[in-house]
């Protein structure tokens, strides 16, 4: 059995929510089946699996195809696809989960300094392949965010920094049941470090537990999102929680 994920390694994405993340196009009357179109870029091709493409083009560059096809098998972005990412070279955001995006209503949009979704989070240069995949060479995932050999391990790019860091603040009345709210401190945040610690001051053990509890409740799915026939079944993403120490 693979080890369970550490809550400090990534924000929680409930398994029940995978089915409502993204989109899929299926043939009428034959749900989940697709015609094989050799003209569609093969996600397994070496160029599409390179670090450069994964970090700076995967689900960023627009797909040149106009015909309906399986978006999960295509490395390009499609209009309306939730897996679409912002180019980290063009937009300044860090590999820290956006707390507003979980409600599907981050008012900052592309100007937000935090990652919107699984792909922006794990394909960010500060995180992509900076950890080893527990499955190693046995990994069968078409797109894995982790390294499968020592030579694939990357050093986190320190230039991707965030101005804000989350800290738990004791609320005086109101707030959630724990009497804790979240505050953003205007200070440097190194995305290569654990989201539990930032700046010069370390949180005490009690604050760490509170912060981890807050992060464990985070998700990337719009709470008001209504599934449609264009939804993408990403049940295969249950491997995320299994592959992170």
UniProtKB/Swiss-Prot annotation:
It is found in: Nucleus. Transmembrane segments: none annotated. Its main location: nucleus. One of its GO terms (molecular function) is zinc ion binding. Keywords: Differentiation, DNA-binding, Metal-binding, Nucleus, Transcription, Transcription regulation, Zinc, Zinc-finger. This is Zinc finger CCCH domain-containing protein 54. GO terms for cellular component: nucleus. Interacts with MARD1/FLZ9 and RD21A. It comes from Arabidopsis thaliana. PROSITE patterns: ZF_C3H1. The gene is TZF6. Embryo-specific transcription factor required at the globular to heart stage transition in embryo development. GO terms for biological process: cell differentiation; embryo development ending in seed dormancy. Residues 175-204 are annotated as: Disordered. Specifically expressed in embryo (at protein level). Pfam families: zf-CCCH (PF00642), zf-CCCH_AtC3H23 (PF25512).
